[in-house]
């Protein structure tokens, strides 16, 4: 029956993976904020901002 206990330990490892996924989700939200900043760059008539390559395609 000792073998059965070892299998249970593997299941516990899966629980740890769930915690890691939650952390990654938070990071993804930060990336979305960057997209919003890009839109604002295009709307702004700042030559300095355009040089950054934020709205390079829109300049054409």
From Swiss-Prot:
Region annotated Disordered, chain positions: 1-60
Top-level lineage group: Bacteria
Keywords: Metal-binding, Nickel, Repeat, Zinc
Biased composition (Basic and acidic residues): 36-60
UniProt-listed InterPro entries: Hpn-like
2 X 5 AA repeats of E-E-G-C-C, as annotated region: 38-55
Biased composition (Basic residues): 10-35
One MF term in the entry's GO annotations: metal ion binding
Repeat region (Sequence), residues: 38-42, 51-55
Its job: Strongly binds nickel and zinc. Binds other metals less strongly: cobalt > copper > cadmium > manganese. May act to increase, or at least to preserve, urease activity. Exact function is still unknown.
Name of the protein in its database record: Histidine-rich metal-binding polypeptide
Species whose genome carries this gene: Helicobacter pylori (strain ATCC 700392 / 26695)
